[in-house]
Amino acid sequence: MTVNPDYLVLLFTTTSGASGDKLGSDEKEIVQLVWQVVDLATKKAGQVNELLVKPDHIELSEECQELSGLTDEALTPVDPLEVAIDQLNQRLCAEVDTGAGNTFYLCTDGQLHVRQVLHPEASSKNILLPDCFFSFFDLRKEFKKEFPSEVKLKDLNLQVMADHLNVAVDSSLHAFTAYKVQQMVDIVLALISEPTCHEFTFPEKVNEKFETGTCSKMERVDDNTVIRARGLPWQSSDQDIARFFRGLNIAKGGAALCLNAQGRRNGEALVRFESEEHRDLALQRHKHHMGGRYIEVYKATGEDFLKIAGGTSNEVASFLSRENQIIVRMRGLPFNATAEQVLQFFSPACPVTDGSEGILFVRFPDGRPTGDAFVLFSCEEHAQNALKKHKDMLGKRYIELFKSTAAEVQQVLNKYSSAPLIPVAPSPILSVVAPPTFVPQTAAVPGVRDCVRLRGLPYDASIQDILVFLGEYGADIKTHGVHMVLNHQGRPSGEAFIQMRSAERAFLAAQRCHKRSMKERYVEVFACSAQEVNIVLMGGTLNRSGLSPPPCLSPPSYTFPHGAPVLPAGAVLPAGAVLPVESAGIYPSQFLLGPRPPPHTTTFYPASNTLYMNYTTYYPSPPGSPSNISYFPTGHTPSAGSVLSAQPTALIRMQGHAHSHAYNNGVKEILSMVQGYQPGNSDAFVTFPSMLSAKQPIGDQTVGGGAYLDLQLL
């Protein structure tokens, strides 16, 4: 938008912390506002003005005291930021005489003063900024328009611009902040004078609010405009994310909350900005706070954003086409719930936008309802009234309500109606599967708590950080015994399991290191055993009060086989994975979702434990970790999972025709008959070293007790 201002207000801010290119990066508060007005018509400047601001925490850095000359005592009697902003606006309106129709725009040295200082602090303190703070001129960009071949924009500063325009200001006559403002004024006067005759017509814009919208999977998203935010409170919405990045322009529909495999928020979000410049400013807010939590900010890619926010469903696009609507997610609906029942659930205090058209039920590809739905509300007030019905009853079920986003709608619909967001490893073809990769059972002692669990690690923590954290106990870690746990997006989950040389050292490490700090976060440390690691990775909880089994595990599955193996050396564990147990050793972890019938007879599937888990994905071992494939020391007895062999084998099937015969009491008889192993509940598959030895027991079709057996060569 083209403007023609009558006045420019050269504004300079000072915080209690860093200055220059680091201004605002440390989240410090404003302590000083200095400005000077320039009449663009007469090319004359007014007086230099100053307002001191009282921060909530008066603690000036040495850099601030040295440059500004301020002291803690000088800030004690002054007004806070909200009053200072109001005074600044009133004094500007009076000096410019806006009542007579005159207009003015702010002008700053770069983007930081407005985008990284004023707007973030005003947002965190719930201060409503005047309209003049949402449009401003960047003096560096205005200079670059006239001299495009000069220094790169990121290398520009006031001194470079002043030298090029032959502008000199006597620094001895002014304090530092007043000197900077005077320098800006002289640069502006030089730009608008001959021979340059520059016009200030295209100001920078600061978005007043975040706009929701949809994103197509076919859309092109620049990698240099996307960031990933971690550590978000689980109840945060896209509006909360926009508030955290206040001052920076987020693209329409550019805040996408990430969900885990169960459809719940995992504390991460992908944010798309309008330009690379705003993305770079967002990265400077790394470890800034949202409430009491600090948020980590990292670079991401356009592909990452499209995986989360992109959609192709026309139904979803139509539902989300109503802009500026508040979305509420319903979870736990009865499967036979109708739109009319949902409308009655919310009426009359919170009417749904467009009636039944404002309700979107989530369904499986075959049309079955999932129990989820999304509902539109026209304003924040209606949405808040709706959220008050959280856990109210609809039929015989209580309904969970959450504030949602357009990106979450896309993710949930993508999850249920199309391919999963996280690809599942293919079904096993055992003829090409490598031998088991776990450490032999002789390395693990059942029930011994010789492992340590770390919880609450910083997401960027490395193995070296963990060794430093454990201190003297780092020497007691087994070789390649540090195992980082990843979430379903392949990102660090903040947990790790460590194999110690003895239970005593694991106990001492847990006692001495519990709740020590690592990178500003305290870390919880618990001693545990390999069996307890199984439970935790399957969704159970482990703390100093004891172990709680996961709700997804059936009671008979709590019993672990004798000598359960420990973690593979150097393995990287996905959250939700299950450590291999004796009779399930050859199965990939995603195959342990439940018992399955024997597949095609050309492959061999031994009986498996009834193991249940929510979801898991594969992750490679970290670089440098030795491979343990085919590692079986001399004298090791193969487990049930090690039946795969490079030697040729033959199989026979034993099918009992006498219902009274039960194999749970007949294992020894079968072993004595065929010298085999691994019986099942009704059928048994037995492997032999050669075809000849497999044919011998077929001649005898009975076993002790008189039961007739059908022996077949496979």
UniProtKB/Swiss-Prot annotation:
Subcellular localization, as worded in the UniProt entry: Nucleus
Main localization, broad class: nucleus
Listed transmembrane segments: none
MF-aspect GO terms: mRNA binding
Function comment: mRNA splicing factor that regulates the formation of epithelial cell-specific isoforms. Specifically regulates the expression of FGFR2-IIIb, an epithelial cell-specific isoform of fgfr2. Acts by directly binding specific sequences in mRNAs. Binds the GU-rich sequence motifs in the ISE/ISS-3, a cis-element regulatory region present in the mRNA of fgfr2.
Homology family: Belongs to the ESRP family.
Protein name, entry field: Epithelial splicing regulatory protein 1
Provenance organism: Danio rerio (Zebrafish)
Species classification: Eukaryota, Metazoa, Chordata, Craniata, Vertebrata
